[in-house]
Amino acid sequence: MPRAAGVPSAIRRPICAPPPSSARRRHSVGASRSAGGGASMSFRGADFMNDSFTPVHVDDPMPHRKVIRSWITPFGQRVIARSIVLLVVDYLLLFAAFAGALLAPSSIVKIVCGMAAGFVTGRLFIIGHDACHQSLTPNHRLNRWLGRIAFLPSLTPYSLWEVGHNVVHHGYTNLKGFDFVWAPHTPDEFAALSPTRRFLDRLYRSGWAPGLYYLVEIWWLRMYFPTKTYLGASRPVFRRDCLLVTGFAAIWIGAVVWIAAATHQSALLLVVTGVVVPFLFWCSMFGFVVYVHHTDPRISWHANRTEWSRTAPFVSTTLHLTFPFGIGALMHHIMEHTAHHVDMSIPLYGLKDAQAKLEAMLPGRIVVQRFSWRWYFDTARRCKLYDIERKCWTDYLGRPTSDAHLRADAPMADQRPIDAPRDA
């Protein structure tokens, strides 16, 4: 029997990972057999790596992304009617929250309703985010329209988000010099910053100001009429989308002022409760979301593209944050984030099952964290700077606050955060 043509490239061992002892033993057994036996072993290895029911042991090599994606393909069915219903329901919730923010007799109730409007704005943004990935419906043209509609309350220009998020963030997650979202400075970079930028970095990473980070560093500098410093080459569609959200904001503010006059209320108060509070709550909500998606002492950043690509970044750079009381579902399952990075075509209503499948198939590989404020502020305390040379997080004094990642493909189970002294 001729020797098999070989195992498909999608299931070959990454070059950075030496075969574990068990694999070496299997190889030695296969080598002692005839050529036909060797072919049989090769095919069995291929079948094992492509098997969507047998979990991959933590010491085995990470399967190719194509293999991993094949496990969750069944959860990628997109339904137009379901997606439109989600959008309509969230807009109805938004109108109800705005009604409370503008018409409730109590100022406190107005503020609470304004915060609720900010939360629903976040839900609508997640729908738009799916549309921007072309994962909301199977119709690309419809996705572009629905995405722009869903992005209006958050004042997000669709085309600019598409480039910054889909191309840059998803294409180069946690790769220094490419991915800019919550990218940590190295100790040398931080030392070279101006006093103002050092102050801002400390404020952003204090745990108390994720909304300020999103408002300034993402929305203002990179989304809303960005300059060439942050945008590079411009396209007419960028300006059109910026004008679209600007027009929506003008109509929104004008309607609030008109309602204030019609109901004999303070225009300033209603602008605060019906415009400022919802927008700031939305910025805080999503600044928090994008921070916790990729920041944890067990998650690395990389400066070398080759090294980065060997770490299976679509799995190793993301965190699945779980919540009680169905909060994850209220956020349209955006926290099932590993599944989203493995396959961006999975719609939001398929992410929960897709994430569960990945965690069943890759035990010990995925960072899963139950949310608590203790964990959040401990992460904020540890994850100030990232030392590329030592491959660990540090505080602002350069003291390590996480284990060094000694192996590029080390399982998450071996990468435990360590205690570190608090900042002075």
For each feature predicted by the language model, list its residue ranges.
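Cytosolic juxtamembrane amphipathic/interface segments immediately preceding
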Residues: 69-78, 231, 354
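Polar-ligand-bearing catalytic/cofactor-coordination segments
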Residues: 53, 71-73, 297-301, 353, ...
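Short, Lys/Arg-enriched N-terminal segments with co-localized hydrophobic residues
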Residues: 29, 33-47
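Alpha-helical bilayer-embedded segments of polytopic membrane proteins, i.e.
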Residues: 77-124, 154-156, 201-218, 234-289
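Conserved beta-strand-loop-alpha-helix hinge in the C-terminal portion
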Residues: 5-31
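Membrane-embedded catalytic scaffold of the fatty acid hydroxylase/desaturase
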Residues: 121-128, 132-242, 298-384, 388
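C-terminal regulatory/interaction regions
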Residues: 383-424
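Short, charged cytosolic
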Residues: 42-67, 209-222
